[in-house]
Regions:
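Short gly/ser/thr-rich secondary-structure transition/capping motifs
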Residues: 47-53, 107, 129-130, 260
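N-terminal helix-turn-helix/winged-helix DNA-binding helices
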Residues: 2-8, 46-84, 92-95, 103-104, ...
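Central regulatory/effector-binding core of bacterial HTH transcription factors
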Residues: 88-134
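Bacterial carbohydrate/catabolite-sensing allosteric modules
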Residues: 1-4, 15, 20, 47, ...
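A short acidic, amphipathic alpha-helical/loop segment
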Residues: 82-85, 112, 136-140, 259
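N-terminal helix-turn-helix DNA-binding module of bacterial transcription factors
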Residues: 1-65, 257
Length: 275
């Protein structure tokens, strides 16, 4: 018997130069797809003898409802607690959760989104990586009507729903607390300046200084990467200033723990030097 290769949706998509979800919708006359592309897809399917796999279709119909989640990591307490909340809520509402990590990589983030779309998840919840400055892979989800909710590190808030804490107010309150307790030179350690969350928290810090009529000193604001080692380097940079700060506001737990270690180590070295 002749061993014939069955034409797949992937074959049709490659021939048409579109994505697999797009050609699938075109074959179903989706109103989201142009009439011209629908006609082309059907004609090509007939020409290439494409036949839908009834077994695969049956599996899809009976598949559990799935939500895809993308986070920078699963080690940080913040993201671990967020994932716990997402999964608990999803299970309570009959959904299954697929968790992926970007490892703070733009390329990993893009690949995760592509994979989740190809898996036909019903929606995606994501926190952007620190490397992400191009949002074309995010805006493309709008074109295929893929529901997306961004949290913590967000973008394109006019197109997608987002969940964020009031970073500006919390940073302002924390800075004010340090000032009220006698600190006069409060430094700020944050992540990369392009991140919206960093902008908001830095704004709150600066606003507290302005309200207290304290001059803003650029050398007291160190924004690097949200990373433990980078946090230690930032703290050591601040402590090496001719006039070091007497308090440090770190924008998250990772940087705060890094700052505490660096301060402790610096004081230990100073003590050993004096002995």
């Amino acid at each position: 018997m002749e061993n014939r290769k069955h034409t797949s949706l992937k074959d049709l998509a490659q021939a048409l130069g579109v994505s697999i979800p797009t050609v699938s919708r075109a074959l179903k006359d989706s109103p989201e797809i142009s009439r011209e592309l629908c006609a082309k897809a059907k004609a090509l399917a007939k020409e290439m003898n494409y036949r839908p796999n009834p077994f695969a279709m049956s599996l899809r119909k009976n598949a559990p409802r799935i939500i895809g989640v993308i986070v920078p990591d699963i080690v940080t307490h913040f993201f671990a607690s967020i994932l716990n909340g997402i999964e608990n809520m999803a299970i309570a509402n009959g959904y299954f959760v697929i968790i992926t990590t970007s490892h703070e990589s733009y390329e990993h983030e893009k690949r995760n989104i592509e994979n989740l779309v190809n898996m036909r998840v019903e929606g995606i919840i994501a926190c952007l990586s620190q490397e992400t400055t191009d949002f074309s892979h995010i805006s493309a989800l709008k074109d295929i009507n893929m529901p997306l909710i961004l949290f913590d590190r967000v973008c394109l808030t006019d197109q997608f729903s987002s969940v964020i804490a009031d970073g500006a107010q919390s940073a302002q309150m924390a800075t004010q607390h340090l000032l009220d307790n006698g600190s006069e030179r409060v430094a700020f350690i944050g992540g990369a300046n392009h991140l919206d969350i960093v902008k908001r928290r830095k704004h709150g810090y600066l606003e507290a200084l302005r309200e207290n009529r304290i001059p803003i000193e650029k050398e007291l604001v160190v924004c690097r990467k949200i990373d433990y080692e980078e946090g230690k380097i930032a703290t050591e940079t601040l402590l090496s200033l001719p006039q070091p700060p007497d308090a440090i506001l770190a924008m998250n737990d990772t940087l705060a723990f890094a700052a505490m270690e660096a301060v402790s180590y610096t004081h230990l070295r100073a003590h050993e030097t004096r002995r």
